[in-house]
Amino acid sequence: MYSLLTALSVPLLAGLAHGYANPGSCSGSCNVHDPALIVRESDGKYFRFSTGNEISYASASSINGPWTAIGSVVPAGSKIDLSGNTDLWAPDLSYVDGTYYCLYSVSTFGSQDSAIGVASSTTMELNTWTDHGSVGVASSSSKNYNAIDGNLLVDGSSYYLQFGSFWGDIYQVKMASPLKTAGSASYNIAYNATGTHSEEGSYLFKYGSYYYLFFSSGTCCGYDTSRPAQGEEYKIMVCRSTSATGGFVDKNGNACTESGGTIVLASHGTVYGPGGQGVYDDPTYGPVLYYHYVDTTIGYADDQKLFGWNTIDFSSGWPVV
């Protein structure tokens, strides 16, 4: 979820909690940025996707690993005719009617000239992916949003695409299928009114009677050359609603469209800047929050970021790791 670097607004820091669990174990190939996780229906094999190398991906027998690198989803680059179409970002995986869909973003750092594309495969094996190009969501400087960081929610027979990074922050649009929008207008579902609007990387997850909108906020990248003030680095936040299409509020009742958001996971111990998250209902561990983070004992460079995961406790109605 590359974006403009910025500071997290002071209002969003309210409610910061401590005592987070350390990340679960990871062995094998554990360096990732913006991970996406899915398990193959036919055999239970785990697949993990990441920003870079035309969407790199790896497989393992469990979420712990050992992770083995496979290759790239779109090795020739996206057919979307925009700068950045050979350096794809922010994968998101879904499974619909026997087919796996991998969303990706085409953009360049700090630009609104962006689009969300999709590739599909029935097996997720190397060289089986078909690139379909744009899903119909794109942006330029004339838009209120930046069309990156797509996330598809499959809710029964309905499909919703969450997307956005900075500018107008998080938007949603109805999809006709995992491949194309329904042609309706997009609408804002989360917005930080302060600073340069540091929200991105949304992930909408249904659990029980609520839809939980997870997102990353703060400065994401480049920590090896310049680190933000304490508390202004990446962190994972959430709002919830009984509707998939809006009305998201934080734990204090603040609207997510009015700078609301409850912190789920922030820097702690040797874990720094967790973000780029998703949620998966694991058959062994139950709901799991996965993300990338910096291990401060290893290094702060983007290519040193690691795959992290924690189980989520929803018993209070709010996610706790």
From Swiss-Prot:
GO terms for biological process: arabinan catabolic process; xylan catabolic process. Glycans are attached at residue 192. Its EC number is 3.2.1.99. GO terms for molecular function: arabinan endo-1,5-alpha-L-arabinosidase activity. It catalyses: Endohydrolysis of (1->5)-alpha-arabinofuranosidic linkages in (1->5)-arabinans. Pathway: Glycan metabolism; L-arabinan degradation. The record marks 149 as: Important for catalytic activity, responsible for pKa modulation of the active site Glu and correct orientation of both the proton donor and substrate. Belongs to the glycosyl hydrolase 43 family. This is Arabinan endo-1,5-alpha-L-arabinosidase A. It comes from Aspergillus aculeatus.
